[in-house]
Amino acid sequence: YNHVLELDPKDEMAYNNRGNAKAGLGKWQEAILDYQKATEIAPNFAFARANYALALYETSQTDKAIREMRNIVRKYPRFADMRAALTAAYWVTGNIGEAESNWVAAYGLDTRYKDMNWVTNIRRWPPSMVVALNKFLNLQ
């Protein structure tokens, strides 16, 4: 991705993908910077914004992460990924009603979020978000 960015420093997909690579290595702060850059270049790049929100959550910036998730859902109400993320974040912060409401929407849009293997290994959510969603699914 570094080479792609040398050739085209305005490639939002390369920033997002490099952010994903850094997140996979546990370099969350570096990932956040790449996701931010991707969204600066392309403000409507919903998945870069979603990845940014998830990375914020992983770095314990919970309020900021939830605010970003809510903003994404406001703009893209059928974005199952952020509905599921809000479910998890709200559940562990004790906002049960909001968690359940977002889950109805998320599950209605994409049933894969009930499969923790998919969330962990295919979608590759951050560990803290996986734990939070698992707590919701197991009513803990």
Model segments located where?
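Terminal, low-structured helical/coil segments at or just beyond the last alpha-helical repeat
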Residues: W103-Q140
